[in-house]
Curated annotation (Swiss-Prot):
Region annotation Disordered: where it falls in the sequence: 317-360
Source species of the chain: Saccharomyces cerevisiae (strain ATCC 204508 / S288c) (Baker's yeast)
GO BP terms: cellular response to pheromone; protein K48-linked deubiquitination; proteolysis
Lineage, broadest ranks: Eukaryota, Fungi, Dikarya, Ascomycota, Saccharomycotina
The family this protein is said to belong to: Belongs to the MINDY deubiquitinase family. FAM63 subfamily.
The protein, known as: Ubiquitin carboxyl-terminal hydrolase MIY1
Length: 360
């Protein structure tokens, strides 16, 4: 059976529209892109066919949607036929899942998947950004990491701490891993206060874009210096007054629902069950996302503890070495006695290091 999308009638600033709602795949990139093409005045001149399709009924099939988007892409592009064919072959992945890698300076790794959005002249943004002004020496460097490169550094640091691998820049890897782990631990919703501020400043008024967050894609709109995401959860299908959700806080605690004209919306308890999941609230992340966040927290905690233990051991050894040097000056020790004691200490230290290594 072909997958389909349910449509919903909304009125935005006095104009009637039909938008697409989420199906079982959740807030996918295909949905966010299609709704921008439907709503954005900058794109509607190319999307008449899509608007007609959505207005046709209460549901449209995934196959029909992809075919119409392919037709639109052929209209707007000036790329050679070979290039456009390769990009169009990626269209189904907008629904299935994309390889999107956010970088902690606010950009993305330049992948083929990102080229699809450029093809439709639609911006993709995120707010998972490190504030490089707090500690310029550390955070400026960390801001050039992406999510995937951060994961590689965390794994590499774990291997170093367990003695599995060692190289000349091990200290640098361990330092970066500790700070990256703390950053991931402090931003489990993949949005930071600094990143949210940057989005408000960067995005243009009355313009649409796609917000990437927690592997989800949302239709984002800036209206009068405030950010709003289009509400596409199927649970709100019958809530005509709920069109937008403000993006005011990192954890969703200050976010609110708004009508199509951006006035406060009233939630009817009979229409909407209180346990409906909100798209990006920390308490409503998908199960696998919660597990990933907990894994990141645990890894960050272990790395921090291991780094502290390493520093403590180094300081202890330095003090012992300093004490021995002073003892040698004031009370010389016989060579054979010193050798036996040194051998015993080295053996004990070796046994202790082996017992403390935990394979992660």
């Amino acid at each position: 059976m072909d997958l389909s999308f349910t449509t919903k009638s909304v009125k935005i600033n006095g104009q009637n529209h039909r938008i697409l709602l989420q199906n079982e795949n959740g807030p996918c990139a295909l949905l966010a892109l299609a709704n921008i093409l439907i709503l954005s005045p900058d794109h509607t001149r190319f999307s008449n066919e899509l608007i007609r399709l959505v207005n046709k009924g209460s549901q449209i099939s995934l196959k029909e949607l992809i075919e119409v988007l392919a037709d639109i892409a052929l209209q707007v592009t000036d790329k050679p036929s070979t290039d456009i064919s390769e990009l169009l072959s990626l269209l189904p992945r907008l629904h299935e899942g994309l390889n999107i890698n956010p970088e902690f300076n606010g950009s993305f790794e330049n992948t083929k998947e990102m080229s699809i959005f450029r093809l439709f002249n639609v911006d993709v943004v995120h707010g998972w950004v490190i504030n490089s002004f707090i500690n310029e020496n550390i955070d400026e460097k960390l801001s050039h990491y992406s999510y995937e490169s951060a994961q590689r550094i965390l794994t590499q640091a774990a291997d170093i701490n367990c003695g599995i691998s060692q190289d000349e820049n091990s200290d640098e890897v361990l330092r970066d891993a500790m700070h990256l782990g703390l950053f991931l631990n402090e931003s489990p919703t993949q949005l930071t206060a600094f990143g949210l501020l940057r989005l408000r400043e960067k995005l243009l008024h009355n313009k649409f874009s796609i917000l990437f967050r927690n592997d989800h894609f949302s239709t984002l709109f800036k209206y009068e210096d405030r950010l709003y995401t289009l509400v596409t959860d199927f649970g709100y299908k019958n809530c005509k007054d709920i069109v937008w959700q403000s993006l005011d806080s990192v954890d969703g605690s200050c976010d609110a629902f708004f009508a199509g004209n951006f006035s406060a919306a009233e939630v009817n308890g009979q229409q909407l069950s209180t346990d409906i999941e909100r798209d990006f609230g920390t308490g409503n992340l998908l199960l696998e996302e919660i597990q990933q966040i907990e894994n990141d927290k645990e890894l960050a905690k272990q790395l921090q503890e291991q780094e502290q233990e390493r520093v403590t051991k180094f300081e202890a050894k330095r003090k012992i070495h300093s004490h021995k040097k002073n003892s040698e000056i004031h009370a010389p020790v016989k060579k054979d006695k010193f050798k036996r004691r040194s051998s015993l200490l080295n053996a004990k230290a070796s046994e202790k290091e082996k017992s403390e290594c935990v394979v992660m």
